[in-house]
């Protein structure tokens, strides 16, 4: 097993840990989930480049009769990338005392102001940064508003 194989195993393990945390652990942290809203995906060009480069590496490994374990590890990495970028749905998860946005816990007390832009983006102003929340379905913003009013 080469250093390349070890690095590939490390990347696969990190992506797998992230997928398990995002799918199973995060919704159970900090109390019961009150509301989970699917968000719009960001640009997919990065994911196309990532998976495309891995496919090129797989092709190169196969045509040059590279190590079989490396080819399988590259395939597993491509599948993990495909899952993370295309199958997994990003979401905002509201709890009793705060919410998870981009896998970061934010308490309601940190929200200084909220605005709704014309194109349906909810803007939350925190102490030092702004969160731009782009929901998949515009009607979900009403659910978020009702939840935030009831918890504040």
Swiss-Prot record:
Bilayer disposition of the protein: Multi-pass membrane protein
InterPro entries: DUF986
Protein localization: Cell inner membrane
UniProt xrefs under Pfam families: DUF986
Record keywords: Cell inner membrane, Cell membrane, Membrane, Transmembrane, Transmembrane helix
TM region positions: 6-26, 45-65, 67-87
CC per GO annotation: plasma membrane
Keyword match DNA damage: no
Main localization category: membrane
SS bond partners: none
Similarity comment: family membership: Belongs to the UPF0266 family.
Name of this chain's protein: UPF0266 membrane protein YobD
